[in-house]
Structures are given as C-alpha cells and as structure tokens.
C-alpha cells in the first residue's frame, strides 16, 4: 500500500543549492547582521541529508530549522514543503500532516499547495489498516484526497488521489462486510442487514456490493421477507449478471419459493441504485 510520491519533491530538489539569501533585511535593521545559521546553508544541509544520506528524519529537522530561523521568507516556504515530504519519507505521518497542513494554510495560492494537500491524504492513506480494525484514517484519507480532486482538478495529483479514494472506499466497504458477516454468523439478521445496507447505499462502486446484495437476499430469506430477497437478487443479476454471487442469490431465492428476477421498484434496494444512476431491472 505504500506509495511514495516524489513528483514535486524531485522538482524541489533540483533547486540550485546556492540561491541568494532572501528577506534578511525585513527582519533586521542592521544590514551587516549575519544569521548564525544562514537559510541557504540549512536548506542545503537538509537536501544533502535527504538525497545523499537518505536520513529523512534529520533532513526534516533541518528544513524545520529554516522555517524557525527565517520565518515568512521564500526559504521558509520551500523548507516547509520539503519538511512535509521528508517526514512522509520517514513514515512520520503525523508530522507530515502537520507540516503540510501549515503549508496549505500559509500558502493556499501556491502552485505547490496541491502537492501539500496530496501529502496530507497520502499520509492518512498509508496508515489504513486491515478491515478488522477501525477505519477512521480511511475516512480522513478520503476527505483529504477529495480536497485534492475538488480544489486542484487539473493538477498532476488529481488522478492518483482519485485512485486512492477508490481504494480507501473499498477498504471501508470491506469493514462493513466484515462486521455484517459476523452478525450473519450470529444469526443477528437485522444487524447484518444494517451493515450490508451501508455497502449498497454508500459504497456501490466498490467490489463488495455484489456480495452485499447476495447477503441481503440471504438475510431477508431467513426473516421470511421474500419480496426484499428477490429484489436484492434481481438488482444483483441486472447489474452483475456474470457474478458468482448472483448465481448464489438466484439459487437461494428460487429455493425459498421466490422469483429472483422480480424487482420491487419501491424497495430501498432499488431506490438506492436508481439514486446513484445505476440500472435496475425492468421487472417489478
């Protein structure tokens, strides 16, 4: 799952190592004042640690020092973004998020703001755990990455952000399926239906929706609600006719005496697919 984005970082690293120091006169009345640690020196030390030593944590510290000693300068702006990138490379995601958020807040109109926002989303995304764990970070990843797509649709990061959103949504749907199966095995059919319903209504574009529809047929049959069971099967068959899950749902409904191709258009299942612009069957 680890995807180390380096597009902007590569461009920043190519910045000449001896750019003139900027902005000192803005903060010091004495034109002869020489900072103990000049910004260009600190910045170049950070680049050396980042590129040559691959000591990302120490590199981030150098970039942070640039920001502290030369606030509001062009050096500070560049260093803040490089700090976020270095923290990301060091797997220090919370620090990366903090630096990247600060960059977006201070420099919302910068051409590099899209990358900073992308780093925020990627930091959350890289912390998504398996479906048996809480998915709070998946939600944060989706929110942050959606901001990339919404605010910077023409940026080079929008497509990658969209892909990660899809994978994060798939992860969240998988969590709902995991809990739903648990309830189903406990014969808590209402609890299971509520979980599978989340997948059908909120995560229809994920790979889990096929199984969710079949499981709904299974649960409704167990409760004796054949109308909903056959609607779930009909919607499944119409949208995924070659799915192995449809074959299972078809057989379940048939065995229960229902008609797996008959859809109740007033069912929440049918309405959920209509709302998303997805197709439903012509029967019902």
Show which residues each predicted segment covers.
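Acidic, polar-rich low-complexity tracts and alpha-helical solenoid repeat scaffolds
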Residues: 2-6, 20-284
């Amino acid at each position: 799952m680890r995807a180390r984005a380096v597009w902007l970082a590569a461009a920043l690293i190519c910045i000449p190592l001896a750019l003139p120091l900027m902005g000192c006169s803005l903060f010091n009345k004495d034109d002869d004042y020489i900072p103990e640690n000049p910004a260009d020196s600190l910045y170049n030390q950070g680049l050396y640690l980042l590129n040559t030593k691959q000591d990302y944590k120490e590199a981030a510290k150098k970039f942070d020092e640039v920001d502290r000693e030369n606030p509001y300068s062009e050096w500070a702006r560049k260093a803040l973004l490089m700090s976020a990138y270095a923290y990301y490379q060091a797997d220090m995601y919370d620090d990366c998020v903090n630096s990247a958020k600060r960059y977006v807040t201070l420099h919302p109109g910068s051409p590099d703001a899209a990358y900073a926002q992308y780093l925020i989303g990627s930091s959350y995304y890289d912390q998504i755990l398996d479906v048996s764990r809480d998915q709070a970070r998946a939600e944060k990843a989706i929110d942050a990455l959606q901001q990339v797509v919404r605010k910077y649709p023409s940026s080079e990061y929008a497509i990658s952000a969209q892909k990660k959103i899809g994978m994060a949504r798939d992860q969240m749907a998988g969590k709902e399926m995991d809990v739903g199966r648990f309830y189903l095995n406990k014969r808590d059919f209402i609890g299971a239906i509520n979980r599978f319903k989340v997948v059908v209504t909120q995560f229809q574009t994920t790979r889990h929706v096929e199984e969710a529809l079949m499981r709904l047929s299974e649960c409704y049959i167990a409760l004796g609600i054949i109308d909903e069971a056959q609607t779930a099967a009909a919607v499944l068959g119409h949208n995924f006719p070659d799915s192995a899950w449809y074959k299972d749902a078809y057989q379940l409904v048939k065995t229960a005496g229902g008609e797996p191709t008959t859809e109740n258009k007033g069912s929440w299942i049918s309405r959920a697919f209509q709302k998303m612009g997805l197709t439903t069957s012509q029967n019902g």
